Amino acid sequence: MFKTFEMELAGRPLIIETGKMAKQANGAVLVRYGDTAVLVATTASKEPREGTDFFPLTVDYEEKMYAVGKMPGGFLRREGRPGNSAILCARLIDRPIRPLFDKRCRNDIHVVATVLSVDYDNAPELCGMIGASASIGISDIPWDGPIAGVRVGRVDGKYVINPTQEEMAASTMNVTVAGSEEAIMMVEGGAQEAPEEEVLDAIMFGHETIKEICRFQKKIIEEVGKEKRVLTFPEVPAEIEKDVEAFATESLKKAIFDADKLRRDGNIAAAKKAAMEHFAEIYPEHLSDVADALDHLTKEIVRHTITNEGIRPDGRKLTEIRPITCEVGLLPRVHGSALFTRGQTQALSITTLAPMSETQIIDDLTPVTEKRYIHQYNFPSYCVGETKGSRGPGRRELGHGALAERALLPVIPSVDEFPYVIRVVSEILESNGSSSQASVCGSTMSLMNAGVPIKAPVAGIAMGLIEDGGKFSILSDIQGMEDALGDMDFKVAGTAKGVNAIQMDIKVHGISRDILLTALKQAHEGRLYILGKMAECIDKPAEHLSKYAPKIISLTIPVDKIRVVIGSGGKTINKIISETGAKLDVEEDGRVYIASEDEAAAQKAKAMVESLVKEVEVGETYLGRVTRLMKFGAFVEILPGKEGLVHVSQLALQRVEKPEDIVHEGDEIMVKVTEIDDKGRINLSRKALLLEKKNK
């Protein structure tokens, strides 16, 4: 039965409709917020997927170009694979809903958010997140929701929920917060060197509104929600768990606590293999249960030892950061490079500089924009010793690249300060946790090595959380095992002054303000330590660009002179390009960017542009070229497209009968501007200069 529910959210109506669309899904809602409308449908398989050892949840976010009245590009004029924006939005929805499913669930669950209509003030991804929660909540799928998400901005020193496009342009913060009525589940966002206290206040400010949306959803679920189905999960028999614990605890402890990842992984595998062989005869029908018990025991040993003894698998203290080494300028032909190694995580970051014509055009459901700073992250299989083939960047790689880009964007110089398009690629060569934050550190040094005048160095650190028996431990610079077996992955990147980017994912049902505050403070201390290590390698941007980088000169011309520089059919600008070899980009606001690998060529092109737009002034002297001879004088081009007349009486000191007695077409002569009449005609004199020379 069709029903509509409404609440006010940030001064605008939030409407959730049920029972009208996608009625064959387990649960479906249409979320309206302003003129934004997103349909979210959730389905679940009736039976568990056989042979699966993970929870098979898939979230798809489908951007339809008709939602903003655009025609899809390409020959087929049809939406294809999801773009970067859609993938990042899908991740944003996935992360807060995933922890609230039973991790033992093996039924396929598919959440599809389809964007049907968009206005630029109301974010469809937030509607998708609320819709995902509501659609699961009213379905028969067991789940511990609801959750909700909001965006928090900071305008004129005040926090704003779901800022409009105009407010967002003035905001110094852009943080998406998701959570349940009880706790925070996910954080994703950026700021401009914000103090940790401001970031925490923004998160908690957002949570107050999240509570209201969750209560709103609970009313909907009470009224139209289906009865939840009962899922049964295989349990490891208590006897097997007890026997495995007795047999394998000591061997696993010895294997787990080793500073070297590869050796540790090998020792753990050997200990598990020995246990499996031992129990093969005792429990031949329950070997999968034995394997599950071994995995559970490994996790419990790690977590218990950290929270009760303060010892981590590699022997570090809770706040200790792995050894760091840095190197810059490794690659001779690239414009900038740096190698950042932290423990067994290593990132090679390469910077490329290009003319402004190389900006990336972003054409999705948002207004068309251009990006001049691009950060990309690659995670090849060899970095973790695996043999998977390369299939292009996946969701994780796109997410990590976006996080690193957000961390560095606030320190990138403006186009007026540095008129280059900047691309940084982070190649992860080794990974044992925190690779996205290693890419932030490596990219900072690569940018400085390239000579990009960044405003301040940026470093990143990943924090972890272990909750056990009512106690919690915050871990600095988590490694792979701590990420896999822990309860939180909390990435914080910024300068010495404050936070630029933040990302938090959890595996529990939420975390408190106290945990967040402790993690942020500990991250600040770790970030300062890492920045100090980076400064030992490179502490300021290089004074000169690489000799292989393009030399770019910028200047501004009057807007009404743009057509003069371009010329009819591009004739003038193409002439400059052919004569100098430089590349010219002319913007609508009159900014001109000249790029060339040869500095002299760029300067020559600049001089040619300046001569085109220069205004003729009375009293100024010019070297001109004779273009035409008439009975009454000679026409001389003193600037491109600017001709004046030297009357026959002004050609020489003596009387001249015919102009051709003194000059010929093509001759270059010095002339002085004596008058510009009310019709714009320019009168020139050669005689005046000859008199000046004679009288000296």
Regions found by a protein language model. Give the residues of each.
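Extended amphipathic alpha-helical scaffolds
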Residues: M1-S45, R229-P367, P550-V564, T572, ...
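Long, basic N-terminal domains or extensions that often function
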Residues: M1-T232
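Glycine-rich, flexible beta-strand/loop modules in the N-terminal catalytic cores of phosphate-handling
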Residues: A25-H110, V115-S117, N122, E188, ...
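Conserved phosphate/anionic-ligand binding catalytic regions in large, soluble enzymes, centered on
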Residues: G27-V29, N122-D140, V328-T351, N432-V452, ...
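Flexible, glycine/charged-enriched surface loops at secondary-structure junctions
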Residues: K103-I109, D144-P146, I213-L231, L262-R263, ...
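Mobile "lid/hinge" segments at catalytic clefts and subdomain interfaces of large enzymes
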Residues: D140-D258, L447-E543
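Long, charged amphipathic helices and adjacent flexible linkers at domain junctions
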Residues: E227-A238, Y529-L555, Q603-L623
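Single-stranded RNA-binding regions, centering on S1/OB-family and related RNA-binding modules
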Residues: P550-I552, V559-K696
